[in-house]
Regions:
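Eukaryotic scaffold repeat domains enriched in small/polar residues
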Residues: 1-378, 388-389, 395-428, 433-444
Length: 444
């Protein structure tokens, strides 16, 4: 990087496509470090010019750069958001939100992560704010809470609420408080959706969300393996396992990235692993880990993507690890891109190449199943969906196969239906006629 003073406990990084620069929140050095496309230092913002007065950051945890190049910094210990230019000239200072929900003696506004939409609205993830993401207008006025996590009603929660009725105030104060889990990070897509991660959830589900303007989670989940022991909206490692001390060890997402191709890259702090999902929550790849060898981390804290490279920031080491796309990964993404472009036949060859390298790659089987679906070869589609454990795809292919059979045998089906309808009328009529004829013969 070419830094005289190395990074010290950095907490965030952001890649700005327009300038092709990487911005790093060097937290314990209280500065913003800017790197060029060769990862060399081009600027260090360690002081601010605010109307002639010199100010500084205090443990900035988050950084974001809008399309115009304005830099937004979550100046955590100063309890504010700073908007400045590359030279450190302050363009705006936005302090704590004004909300009755946050009015308490114990509350301290500590913004951690942030994004800014095309209209200048600022979305902030703050520590110990359980009501959701904080939304400010372009002037820094608090607007609303956004996309709050819910507390699910469980038997334990109902039992606790019943007990509270019979307890004193002192006893109630010592009980656990059930509050929504706070988000740990957020990312803004080009289409204006906010993707957010929660480090822990109540039932270890929905750790990754795609939040629309109404605050609803609209992330697609193609639940081809939803069972009692596995759910597609359970992101990260599964199943949960226990250490020797009986402690639950679960995935704890600390950051995520969403790219133009529709892939979500999420970083797990617990095991130091990187998870890549497609836009239907299908798991594509897992890599990384905790350790000292190449490709592992001590305490990962942020993930970013530049073209096909995935970057992971390690706060303890003060270093960035760059993962290059392999030939296998390139073939997978090529197949998906061809399918998305409607080139179903062309997509089959790279999927077959993927399976030659990894016959357990379910996404490839499902990709072939989708290609055969588009070519109306439903028997083959069912075969590959079955290999890929895609129940929904298999069911859709079976329905289409039945619909195709029905169209091809429409005339026979109509005749069969007419016969079925007419039988109750024709049979009694024939029997009645037979009886009449028998009566005529008997009279002779």
């Amino acid at each position: 990087m070419g830094l005289e003073d190395p990074l010290y406990m950095p907490q965030d990084m952001f890649y700005h496509k327009e300038t092709k620069c990487l911005y790093i929140a060097d937290t314990d050095n209280s500065r913003i470090v800017v790197l060029n496309h060769d990862y060399q230092v081009v600027k260090i913002i360690d002081s601010l010019n605010y109307d002639g007065d010199i100010e500084s950051f205090s443990s900035p945890y988050g950084v974001y750069v809008d399309t115009d190049g304005a830099i937004y910094v979550a100046d955590t210990k100063n309890e504010r958001i700073v908007k400045c230019d590359l030279e450190g000239n302050v363009l705006g200072l936005f302090g704590p939100p004004s909300s009755p929900a946050l009015e308490s003696e114990d509350f301290r506004y500590q913004p951690r992560k942030l994004v800014v939409d095309k209209d200048g609205y600022i979305y902030v993830q703050a520590q110990h704010v359980y009501q959701g993401i904080l939304c400010f207008d372009r002037d820094g006025n608090f607007v609303q809470f956004f996309g709050s996590n819910r507390v699910d009603v469980t038997a334990e929660l109902l039992f606790e609420q019943m007990l509270r009725v019979f307890m004193t105030r002192e006893q109630r104060s010592k009980m656990l408080t059930f509050v929504p889990m706070e988000y740990s990070n957020l990312y803004l897509s080009q289409k204006g959706f906010i993707y957010a991660v929660t480090s822990k959830t109540q039932d270890s589900l929905n750790e990754i969300k795609k939040i629309n303007t109404n605050g609803d989670n609209v992330l697609r989940v193609n639940s081809y393996r939803n069972t009692a022991s596995y759910k597609k909206n359970n992101y990260g490692d599964y199943p949960i396992y226990y250490s020797n001390e009986g402690q639950v060890i679960d995935t704890s997402f600390i950051d995520l990235h969403y790219d133009e191709m529709g892939y979500i890259t999420a970083l797990d702090e617990t095991r130091g692993r990187v998870f890549v999902y497609d836009d239907e929550s299908n798991l594509m790849f897992i890599f990384g880990g905790l350790g000292e060898q190449l490709g592992t981390f001590s305490r990962p804290t942020a993930v970013e993507k530049i073209d096909n490279d995935i970057l992971v920031l390690d706060r303890e080491e003060g270093a960035i690890t760059i993962f290059r796309q392999t030939d296998f990964g390139r073939t997978v993404f090529e197949a998906i891109q061809l399918y998305n472009e409607g080139k179903y036949l062309e997509a089959m060859e790279p999927w077959q190449m993927v399976l030659q390298q990894n016959s357990n790659f379910n996404v490839a089987y499902n990709g072939l199943g989708k290609a055969y679906m588009q070519m109306e070869q439903y028997n083959m589609a069912m075969h590959y969906f079955k290999l890929g454990y895609d129940k929904i795809g298999y069911s859709d292919a079976r329905q289409e196969l039945f619909a195709l059979w029905a169209r091809e045998n429409f005339g026979i089906i109509i005749i069969a239906i007419l016969i079925f309808i007419l039988i109750p009328f024709v049979v009694p009529w024939l029997l009645s006629r037979r009886k009449k004829r028998k009566g005529v013969y008997d009279s002779f």
